[in-house]
């Protein structure tokens, strides 16, 4: 009677054993290709191994790959792309950051890191990265889209707070009114103006209806502030 359960258990474990063997075999092929200087073939094997077991493949990267070698960046890119596809943004960010450390001014790496930080809810860090991207590439589309929307939305929040606080005053004095108007003026130059600069660059690259609507709103706010 015990033979049948043991047989069933062995059937269940067999795919796991075969998978482990397949992963080991593929990783051996990766190592052999790297040693032979066949980087393209190594990347192809590595990609196949990721599909079999991404955790084992990641462990191989950390323990077996020379981080100063040319191929290490290519393998890190494969892991980053795979984790991004799986929506594991923490791991994807880890590998994009690994790439960024090797090339701090690489716009593609910065853009990928910034995107992952947005997905991870780290908007402040993404803001810093996108601002650095614009220092390197002023017309970068992704950076201008993010910054245009970020500055506009934060400006709207601050404007609403200014207006709410002012409306709480039952009989505002001239000094309080002047302070309110000065707050609006500073908000426009520090936030709305930055949003406009970025969104104008966006619509130069492609006709965005939403970006144009936001620019129209900013123009109305500018007239309100300067009246």
Language-model-detected regions and their locations in the chain:
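N-terminal leader/linker segments that initiate helical-solenoid repeat arrays
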Residues: 18-62, 69-74
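Conserved structural position within tetratricopeptide repeats
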Residues: 51, 98-101, 132-135, 197, ...
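Short coil turns that delineate tetratricopeptide repeat
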Residues: 54, 70, 104, 138-139, ...
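Short coil/turn linking the two alpha-helices of tandem helical-hairpin repeats
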Residues: 57, 119-121, 148, 153-162, ...
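Short coil/linker segments at helix-helix boundaries
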Residues: 58-70, 153-198
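TPR alpha-solenoid repeat register
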Residues: 58-60, 75, 109, 143, ...
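Canonical tetratricopeptide repeat
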Residues: 62-64, 78, 112, 146, ...
């Amino acid at each position: 009677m015990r033979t049948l359960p043991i047989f069933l258990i062995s059937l269940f474990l067999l795919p796991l054993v075969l998978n482990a063997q397949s992963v080991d075999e593929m990783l051996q092929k990766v190592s052999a290709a790297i040693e032979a200087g066949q980087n393209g073939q190594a990347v192809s094997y590595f990609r196949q191994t990721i599909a079999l077991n991404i955790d084992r493949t990641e462990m191989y990267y950390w323990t077996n790959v020379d981080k100063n070698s040319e191929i290490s960046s290519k393998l890190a890119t494969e892991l980053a792309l795979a984790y991004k596809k799986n929506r594991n943004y923490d791991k994807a960010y880890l590998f994009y950051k690994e790439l960024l450390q090797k090339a701090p001014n690489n716009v593609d790496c910065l853009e990928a890191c910034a995107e992952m930080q947005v997905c991870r809810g780290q908007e402040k860090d993404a803001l810093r990265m996108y601002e650095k991207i614009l220092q390197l590439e002023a017309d970068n589309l992704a950076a201008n889209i993010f910054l245009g929307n970020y500055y506009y939305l934060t400006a709207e929040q601050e404007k609403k707070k200014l207006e709410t606080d002012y409306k709480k005053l039952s009989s505002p004095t001239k000094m309080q009114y002047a302070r309110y108007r000065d707050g609006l003026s500073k908000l426009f130059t520090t936030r709305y103006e930055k949003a406009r600069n970025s969104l104008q660059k966006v619509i130069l690259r492609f006709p965005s209806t939403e970006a144009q609507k936001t620019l129209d709103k900013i123009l109305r706010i500018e007239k309100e502030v300067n009246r």
